[in-house]
Amino acid sequence: MRHFSYLSAPETDRLFHLAPQELSLDSDASLLAAALGATLYCPATRPDLVKDIRKQAARGAVSMVICLEDSIADADVPAAETNLVAALAELHASRNSASGTPTSGTPPELMLFVRVRTPEQLLSLAERCGRSLDVLTGFVIPKFENVTGAAQRFLDALHTVNDARRAAAPGARPLRVMPILESPLMIHAETRTSTLTGIFAVLEANRPDILAVRIGATDMSSAYGLRRSRDLTIYDVKVVSAVIGDIVNRLGRPDGFVISGPVWEHYSSGERLLRPMLRSSPFAEADELGLRQRLLTANLDGLIREIELDQANGLLGKTVIHPSHVPLVHAMSVISHEAYLDALHISGASGGGAAASPYRNKMNEMKPHQAWAASTLVRAAAFGVAAPDITYVDLLEASMN
């Protein structure tokens, strides 16, 4: 799998100074975490899950979550589980024919997760799926906290599954988890610090099992009876942005964990109250004013602004609930040529000092920015480096056509 794999070779050469790396499910975990990008959620009740997964992978999705939790009514859980088990079995069968070679219907590889409700459900699904679990990268764990011991119970269930997989097939790839931070214990101010401390402790003790940490902004907002409009970003909702800041402070340090951006809920047009958040000049310079209008009509300017703020606050990738969001997240995850040269400049001078940047427009201080440079180079491997004259408008145009 590779980001922007749908682009032609000439288009890739035009857009990228350094193309995204080819990835596999066996790639280094830090690279896979950085490469998650737009993680597209899909309810497990979809009537043709396999078709949906194949279609979205072909369109550029690199990570998907099949959801058995909040997107599924309680009464529909048994049917959703059966549907999921059948879909994973079909995907597994299509990956290899009886001779062990890929079949003609083999879907593009992507990171596929299942969002479960309870540790017991995780264990039950694993038993029902058997070898079909090979198509998964892991599980998404809701309302992750360890004050009640819930986090450890989920991790114990994961260990049971991985032990069984290794016993059945020595060398089997271990499954990992992506916890979602959305529990009221972590949201409310009086319990937040102690809860985050406990979360960090259990994550650190089980670091090899953790791919990335996700933020559940919908549950955070609902804890206060709030919901942001399409004219606002999650960072305008101060009580929620304060929680995000504390999460990054505790878990997002250089020796911490990859943390993904919260979901953007809006995808249809409607009456607007505030001015659009996309300047017209970058689109005019690229002769793409029509693209700007398309983004505004679909209410995607707010998403673009929120992605910028996610990145400024140390978050990588984003949870998305509509396929139209995927190309925007990925286009805005490409590293600029300027940032790439800065990262190379800084990482090559670990002894310290300061010097003008390669673009001669800022001061690069070598020691303070080592962690930023290292992170930027990992992201460059995942999403590529834009060519010197390529802007995010060019990447958006190529991604959305």
Where are these regions (language model features)?
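Expand to "…catalyze enediolate/carbanion chemistry for C-C bond making/breaking, isomerization
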Residues: 1-401
